[in-house]
Amino acid sequence: MCAERARGGKPAPLRVVLCWHMHQPQYRDVQARRYALPWTYLHAIKDYVDMVAHLESAPGARVVVNFAPVLLEQIDDYARQVRDNLDHGAGIRDPLLAALAAETPPAGEAERLQLAEACLKANQKHLIEPYPDYRMLTQMVHWLREHPAGLAYQSEGFFADLVTWYHLAWLGETVRREDGRVCALMEKGRGFDLHDRRTLLTVIGEILASVLPRYRRLAEAGRVELAFSPYAHPIVPLLLDLRAAREALPEAPLPAAKAYPGGEERVRWHLDRGMAVFEHHFGRKPLGCWPSEGGLSTATVRLLSEHGIRWTASGETVLANSLREAGALEEGEDRRWLHRPYRVEKTDTTCFFRDDGLSDAIGFKYADWHADDAVGEFVHHLETIAARGVDADTVVSVILDGENAWEYYPANGYHFLNALYARLSDHPLIEMTTFADCVQAIPQPRSLSRLVAGSWVYGTFSTWIGDKDKNRGWELLIEAKQHLDKAIRDGRLGGEHLELALEQLAICEGSDWCWWFGDYNPAVAVSDFERLYRHHLAVLYELMGEPVPEVLSRVFTHGGGHPAAGGTMRRGSEDHQ
C-alpha cells in the first residue's frame, strides 16, 4: 500500500495503540474463601487506581485496557469484604488486610513473624527507602528474622505501625498526592492507632469499590477500550493441543500425556465465562481479547472468531515465525510487516502484533531514566517509524503488563505516564487509538494462511511447558482432569457441585502456575505459587469427593534465580535483553 496522506496533503498520522494488560491469578480458596496471597488488592490500590487516574487526567489519550475476568471477580470480592467489615464488623478473609483492620496484632510468635515478613514484600528502592519510618521498621524486622525470640517483646504499636506503613507505601501515587486522609497519616509517621488504621481501611475500601466503575465510565465516554482474556487466564493453544508447543520449538520435551483431555470444551468454557464476567462488570460485550500471555495458534483464532471476537493480539516473534514459514517475511530495518494487522484465513478476527522493542522499553528500560528523556526517546522511535511512510494499514502495537512495571519507576511511574500521555496525545504525527477503531478503519487486513503457534514471550511456550518441572505441573493437572471427567461420566457430580468443580478446574488451568515453576525464578515466589497450585488441585479432588493424592503433599519445584523484575515480567524477545 502506498503511503497515506490526510486531507490537505499532510502525512496521515501514525496510529499507535497502547494496550495495558491487568491480571492476577485466583488467590482465593473457593471453599474457605480465604486469600493465600495479597497481590490482587495491593495492585488494585497501587496500580489499577493510578492507571485509571492518569487516563482521567489526560482527556486526549486513548488506550486499550485488558482485564482477566478472574481478577475482576477478586477486586469485587475485596470491595465487599472491606465494606462488610466497616459496616458490620465482618471478618476480612485476607490475613494481611485483616491485620490492618484488627484491634490488636497476633499474639503467637509464628503469626507475628509471618505478619512481619509479609510487610517486607515491597520494592526496596521505591516503596521502602523513601519513607524513613517504614525503612526503620523493616530494619527491625530483618533483625527479628535473626532473633525471633525478640518478637514476644515487640509492642503492639510496632506491628500497628508496620502494617500501616506497608499499606501506605503500596498506595498509588495519585492517591498519596490527592487524598487528604492519606497525607495526614503519612505526616503523622508513627504511633498509628485503631482509628488511623480504620481510616486507611476506609480509603482502601473506596478505591476497591470505585476502580472498576471508573474504567467503565471512561469506556462509555469512548476514551478507553476495555478488553478481556479467557476467564482464568489459561494458555489456550496448549489446552487445544499440547503439541502446539513444538510449532516454534520442534524439540521441546512434552508431558507424557498426548493431549489435554477435552481441551476445546474447556477453552469454550473460559471464553463464555470470561465474556459473561466482563459484561457483568462493564455493561457490554468485549470486542477484543488479549489471549492469555498472547498465546495464539490457528485453532485459537478460529475459536475466537466463532465467539464474535473482532480482534486479538500476540507477540512480534509469532508473526515473524508465521511470515517466515510462508516465505513472506520482508527483510529490512523498517519492519513494515510488524506494524500492520493481519487476518487468518477463514476467520473474522483481526490479529495485531506487539512491537517488542517499544513495549519492552517501557517494561524494562525506562524505569531508571528521567521521565522526559524516556518519553523523548520513545516518541523519537515512533517519529522514525512515521518518517518511513505511513500506509493505510499501519498500526504500531505497544502491549505490556499494566501493573508490575511501575514499582521499578520513581513515584509508581507518575511522571513517566503523565509525560507519555501528554506527548502522544498532542503530537501532530501520532494518533492514539484503540484496536477496535483500527478494525473499523482497516476492514481488509493482510491475509495469513496460518499462525505458527506461540506466545508474546520469545514466540514460544517455553515459559509454561517443556522442562521437567513445568511438564510435571501439566501432568498433575491432566491427571486431575481425567478424574473429574470420570466423576462426571459416573454421575457423581451434578448441579452446583459440578459448577464449583468446573470453576476450580479453571483456576488450576491458569497460566501463572507453570510460569513460576523451575529454577529461573526466585525461590520465595516459586514456593508461594507451587504450594498454592498444589492446594488448588487438592481442593478440586475434595470437590469431586475423592481422596487427595499423596503426591500433592510433596514439593516438586524449587526456585533460585534472580530474573529481571523479580520474575513478574518477561521481555518479548531475546533480542531486546
Model-assigned labels for residue ranges:
Residues G9-A184, A328-Q577:
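Active-site and substrate-binding clefts of carbohydrate-active enzymes
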Residues A149, H167-W170, T202-H233, L242-R243:
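Structured, charged N-terminal subsegments at the starts of enzyme catalytic cores
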Residues C2, D47-H54, L208-R217, R273-A276, ...:
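Short alpha-helical segments and helix-capping/turn motifs at coil-helix boundaries
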Residues P250-P291, H380-I399:
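CE4/NodB-like, metal-dependent polysaccharide N-deacetylase domain
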Residues N66-L71, P230-H233, G288-L296, A436-V439:
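Short, solvent-exposed turn/loop segments enriched in Gly/Ser/Thr/Pro and often Arg
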Residues V236-P237, E247-E265, W269-L271, T317-N321, ...:
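Positively charged, amphipathic and often flexible ligand-engagement surfaces
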